[in-house]
Amino acid sequence: MRSVIAVVAFAWLVLAISPAMAREKQEPTFYSQLGHVPEEARIRLNPLERDSDAVLAGRKLYERHCAECHGATGENGRKGPSLLVPEIQTASSGSLFWVITNGNVRAGMPVWSKLPEPQRWQITTYLRSLGPQ
């Protein structure tokens, strides 16, 4: 009888946690958004690439709009992931611009499409400056 109760309890536990585990695996991540960037956005070139003034302006914008979630240096914040990981640093500038523009609301990243396009490129340029030079 004990073994039957143990088997039933185990089966109930498996059934109870399976939906939670499935939801956890399906939760979007910030990095998953990079896999959804359309090709035409991915190949866009940054008009401010290597522009030192754009890096400085992008830093100020980052501090105002991004640092609260991603941390002052991009390493990690209270809510957002590190921006120094290979997934971010090897992504194209066009991909980063697209993610900044469209966000990833399900993963907690706001949409920044209302920021003027030059400012979004400045943030992209600043993010590029955080990686290996």
Residue ranges of model-derived segments:
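Processing junctions and N-termini across compartments
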Residues: 16, 60-63, 103
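Electrostatic cytochrome c docking/interface patches
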Residues: 30-61
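The canonical Cys-X-X-Cys-His
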Residues: 58, 62-72, 123-127
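N-terminal secretory signal peptides that target proteins for export/translocation
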Residues: 1-3
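Conserved functional loop/turn residues at catalytic and ligand-binding sites
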Residues: 65, 70-73, 87, 103-104, ...
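Gly/Gly-Pro-rich "capping" loops immediately C-terminal to redox-active cysteine motifs
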Residues: 52-59, 75-101
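Axial heme c-ligation environment in periplasmic c-type cytochrome domains
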Residues: 22-29, 48, 77-84, 101-133
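Bacterial N-terminal signal peptides
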Residues: 7-16
